[in-house]
UniProtKB/Swiss-Prot annotation:
This is Adenylate kinase. Monomer. It is found in: Cytoplasm. Residues 122-159 are annotated as: LID. One of its GO terms (biological process) is AMP salvage. SUPFAM superfamilies: P-loop containing nucleoside triphosphate hydrolases. The gene is adk. It catalyses: AMP + ATP = 2 ADP. Keywords: ATP-binding, Cytoplasm, Kinase, Nucleotide biosynthesis, Nucleotide-binding, Transferase. ATP binds at residues 10-15, 123, 132-133, 203. InterPro entries: Adenyl_kin_sub, Adenylat/UMP-CMP_kin, Adenylat_kinase_CS, Adenylate_kinase_lid-dom, P-loop_NTPase. Its EC number is 2.7.4.3. Its main location: cytoplasm.
Protein backbone atom coordinates (compact mmCIF):
# COMPACT_ATOMS: atom_id res chain seq x y z
CA UNK A 1 0.00 0.00 0.00
CA UNK A 2 1.70 3.15 -1.26
CA UNK A 3 -0.31 6.26 -0.64
CA UNK A 4 -0.40 10.00 -0.18
CA UNK A 5 -2.64 11.48 2.50
CA UNK A 6 -3.98 14.93 1.63
CA UNK A 7 -5.95 17.34 3.79
CA UNK A 8 -5.81 20.79 5.31
CA UNK A 9 -3.98 21.49 8.58
CA UNK A 10 -6.35 20.40 11.35
CA UNK A 11 -8.19 17.87 9.15
CA UNK A 12 -7.00 14.99 11.36
CA UNK A 13 -4.42 13.49 8.97
CA UNK A 14 -1.99 12.53 11.74
CA UNK A 15 -4.58 10.51 13.64
CA UNK A 16 -5.77 8.65 10.53
CA UNK A 17 -2.22 8.10 9.26
CA UNK A 18 -1.43 6.19 12.47
CA UNK A 19 -4.42 3.85 11.98
CA UNK A 20 -3.70 3.28 8.28
CA UNK A 21 0.00 2.57 8.91
CA UNK A 22 -0.86 0.09 11.66
CA UNK A 23 -3.43 -1.69 9.47
CA UNK A 24 -1.06 -2.09 6.49
CA UNK A 25 2.23 -2.41 8.39
CA UNK A 26 3.80 0.56 6.59
CA UNK A 27 5.81 3.57 7.81
CA UNK A 28 4.46 7.12 7.87
CA UNK A 29 6.89 9.40 6.04
CA UNK A 30 6.92 13.16 6.46
CA UNK A 31 9.50 15.37 4.79
CA UNK A 32 10.45 16.89 8.16
CA UNK A 33 11.22 13.49 9.71
CA UNK A 34 13.00 12.38 6.56
CA UNK A 35 15.21 15.47 6.47
CA UNK A 36 16.07 15.18 10.16
CA UNK A 37 16.94 11.47 9.79
CA UNK A 38 19.15 12.08 6.73
CA UNK A 39 20.98 14.96 8.44
CA UNK A 40 21.47 12.88 11.59
CA UNK A 41 22.74 9.88 9.61
CA UNK A 42 25.17 12.16 7.76
CA UNK A 43 24.34 10.67 4.34
CA UNK A 44 25.61 12.61 1.30
CA UNK A 45 22.06 13.90 0.69
CA UNK A 46 21.70 14.68 4.40
CA UNK A 47 24.91 16.73 4.31
CA UNK A 48 23.62 18.66 1.29
CA UNK A 49 20.30 19.31 3.03
CA UNK A 50 22.06 20.42 6.22
CA UNK A 51 24.19 22.95 4.31
CA UNK A 52 21.06 24.43 2.71
CA UNK A 53 19.11 24.58 5.99
CA UNK A 54 22.09 26.01 7.92
CA UNK A 55 22.15 28.82 5.37
CA UNK A 56 18.49 29.49 6.20
CA UNK A 57 17.30 28.46 2.73
CA UNK A 58 14.54 26.09 1.63
CA UNK A 59 15.56 22.61 0.52
CA UNK A 60 15.00 22.28 -3.25
CA UNK A 61 12.41 19.92 -4.72
CA UNK A 62 15.19 17.96 -6.49
CA UNK A 63 16.92 17.27 -3.20
CA UNK A 64 13.63 16.33 -1.51
CA UNK A 65 12.78 13.89 -4.34
CA UNK A 66 16.21 12.25 -4.05
CA UNK A 67 15.68 11.91 -0.30
CA UNK A 68 12.25 10.38 -0.96
CA UNK A 69 13.70 7.83 -3.41
CA UNK A 70 16.37 6.94 -0.84
CA UNK A 71 13.80 6.63 1.93
CA UNK A 72 11.33 4.40 0.08
CA UNK A 73 14.17 2.04 -0.89
CA UNK A 74 14.66 1.21 2.83
CA UNK A 75 13.60 -2.28 4.03
CA UNK A 76 10.71 -0.95 6.16
CA UNK A 77 9.02 0.30 2.96
CA UNK A 78 8.84 -3.21 1.45
CA UNK A 79 5.04 -3.33 1.98
CA UNK A 80 4.58 0.32 1.06
CA UNK A 81 4.51 3.71 2.75
CA UNK A 82 2.29 6.65 3.61
CA UNK A 83 3.34 10.18 2.67
CA UNK A 84 2.00 12.80 5.06
CA UNK A 85 2.48 16.42 3.98
CA UNK A 86 4.27 15.45 0.78
CA UNK A 87 4.04 16.39 -2.03
CA UNK A 88 3.11 19.88 -0.90
CA UNK A 89 3.11 21.59 -4.31
CA UNK A 90 2.41 20.77 -7.97
CA UNK A 91 6.15 20.96 -8.91
CA UNK A 92 6.88 18.34 -6.20
CA UNK A 93 4.08 16.12 -7.55
CA UNK A 94 5.45 16.52 -11.11
CA UNK A 95 8.98 15.71 -9.91
CA UNK A 96 7.72 12.59 -8.13
CA UNK A 97 5.91 11.48 -11.29
CA UNK A 98 9.02 12.12 -13.42
CA UNK A 99 11.13 10.13 -10.94
CA UNK A 100 8.80 7.16 -11.45
CA UNK A 101 7.67 6.92 -7.81
CA UNK A 102 4.72 4.50 -7.98
CA UNK A 103 1.63 5.14 -5.87
CA UNK A 104 -1.54 3.10 -5.30
CA UNK A 105 -3.82 5.71 -3.74
CA UNK A 106 -4.21 9.39 -3.01
CA UNK A 107 -6.63 9.81 -0.11
CA UNK A 108 -8.04 13.22 0.72
CA UNK A 109 -9.57 13.91 4.14
CA UNK A 110 -12.01 16.71 3.43
CA UNK A 111 -13.14 19.00 6.26
CA UNK A 112 -14.83 22.38 5.64
CA UNK A 113 -12.56 25.27 6.62
CA UNK A 114 -15.08 26.74 9.08
CA UNK A 115 -15.15 23.40 10.93
CA UNK A 116 -11.32 23.37 11.06
CA UNK A 117 -11.25 26.93 12.43
CA UNK A 118 -13.79 25.98 15.11
CA UNK A 119 -11.89 22.75 15.90
CA UNK A 120 -8.48 24.40 16.24
CA UNK A 121 -9.27 27.84 17.65
CA UNK A 122 -11.32 26.26 20.46
CA UNK A 123 -8.40 24.23 21.82
CA UNK A 124 -7.07 25.14 25.26
CA UNK A 125 -4.30 23.49 27.27
CA UNK A 126 -2.78 23.34 30.74
CA UNK A 127 0.96 23.58 30.01
CA UNK A 128 2.23 21.99 33.24
CA UNK A 129 0.24 18.75 32.90
CA UNK A 130 -0.39 18.60 29.15
CA UNK A 131 -4.16 18.31 29.76
CA UNK A 132 -6.18 19.59 26.81
CA UNK A 133 -9.69 20.98 26.51
CA UNK A 134 -11.97 22.44 23.88
CA UNK A 135 -14.28 25.36 24.61
CA UNK A 136 -17.15 23.65 22.76
CA UNK A 137 -16.44 19.90 22.52
CA UNK A 138 -14.65 19.26 25.83
CA UNK A 139 -14.95 22.36 28.04
CA UNK A 140 -13.33 22.66 31.48
CA UNK A 141 -15.68 22.74 34.49
CA UNK A 142 -14.78 26.41 35.07
CA UNK A 143 -14.23 28.51 31.96
CA UNK A 144 -10.52 29.11 31.29
CA UNK A 145 -9.35 27.02 34.28
CA UNK A 146 -7.77 23.56 34.56
CA UNK A 147 -10.13 21.01 36.17
CA UNK A 148 -7.48 19.58 38.52
CA UNK A 149 -5.37 22.56 39.60
CA UNK A 150 -7.67 25.50 38.85
CA UNK A 151 -4.74 27.16 37.03
CA UNK A 152 -5.22 29.25 33.89
CA UNK A 153 -5.52 27.48 30.54
CA UNK A 154 -3.69 28.85 27.51
CA UNK A 155 -4.35 28.96 23.80
CA UNK A 156 -1.26 28.02 21.77
CA UNK A 157 -0.13 30.51 19.10
CA UNK A 158 -0.71 27.81 16.45
CA UNK A 159 -4.36 27.51 17.51
CA UNK A 160 -5.22 31.23 17.40
CA UNK A 161 -7.87 31.96 14.79
CA UNK A 162 -5.68 34.33 12.74
CA UNK A 163 -2.85 31.77 12.64
CA UNK A 164 -5.23 28.97 11.62
CA UNK A 165 -6.70 31.16 8.85
CA UNK A 166 -3.22 32.00 7.54
CA UNK A 167 -2.24 28.31 7.45
CA UNK A 168 -5.44 27.51 5.57
CA UNK A 169 -4.70 30.28 3.05
CA UNK A 170 -1.24 28.80 2.39
CA UNK A 171 -2.82 25.34 2.03
CA UNK A 172 -5.43 26.71 -0.43
CA UNK A 173 -2.76 28.35 -2.57
CA UNK A 174 -0.09 25.64 -2.53
CA UNK A 175 -1.48 22.23 -1.62
CA UNK A 176 -5.20 22.28 -2.40
CA UNK A 177 -4.42 22.30 -6.18
CA UNK A 178 -3.00 18.76 -5.71
CA UNK A 179 -6.57 17.51 -5.20
CA UNK A 180 -7.39 18.64 -8.74
CA UNK A 181 -4.02 17.35 -10.02
CA UNK A 182 -4.48 13.79 -8.76
CA UNK A 183 -8.22 13.52 -9.42
CA UNK A 184 -7.70 14.69 -13.04
CA UNK A 185 -4.76 12.32 -13.55
CA UNK A 186 -6.84 9.39 -12.21
CA UNK A 187 -9.67 10.29 -14.60
CA UNK A 188 -7.46 10.75 -17.68
CA UNK A 189 -4.91 7.97 -17.19
CA UNK A 190 -6.36 5.32 -14.84
CA UNK A 191 -3.81 2.69 -15.89
CA UNK A 192 -0.85 4.70 -14.55
CA UNK A 193 -2.33 7.11 -12.03
CA UNK A 194 -2.92 6.32 -8.37
CA UNK A 195 -6.59 5.86 -7.46
CA UNK A 196 -7.98 9.09 -6.05
CA UNK A 197 -10.40 8.87 -3.11
CA UNK A 198 -11.93 11.63 -0.97
CA UNK A 199 -13.66 11.04 2.36
CA UNK A 200 -15.39 13.35 4.82
CA UNK A 201 -13.23 14.15 7.84
CA UNK A 202 -16.13 15.17 10.06
CA UNK A 203 -17.55 12.82 12.70
CA UNK A 204 -15.89 10.63 15.32
CA UNK A 205 -12.34 9.33 14.89
CA UNK A 206 -13.76 5.80 14.50
CA UNK A 207 -16.21 6.87 11.76
CA UNK A 208 -13.45 8.61 9.80
CA UNK A 209 -11.13 5.58 10.17
CA UNK A 210 -13.89 3.30 8.84
CA UNK A 211 -14.36 5.60 5.83
CA UNK A 212 -10.61 5.74 5.20
CA UNK A 213 -10.10 1.97 5.32
CA UNK A 214 -13.18 1.38 3.13
CA UNK A 215 -11.87 3.87 0.55
CA UNK A 216 -8.49 2.11 0.45
CA UNK A 217 -10.11 -1.31 0.02
CA UNK A 218 -12.02 -0.10 -3.03
Amino acid sequence: MRLILLGAPGAGKGTQAAFICQKYGIPQISTGDMLRAAVKAGTPLGQQAKAVMDAGKLVSDDLIINLVKDRIAQPDCAKGFLFDGFPRTIPQADAMKAAGVKLDYVLEIDVPFDAIIERMSGRRSHPASGRTYHVKFNPPKVEGKDDVTGEDLIQREDDKEDTVKKRLEVYSAQTRPLVEYYSTWAKNDPANAPKYRAISGTGTVEEITRRALAALAD
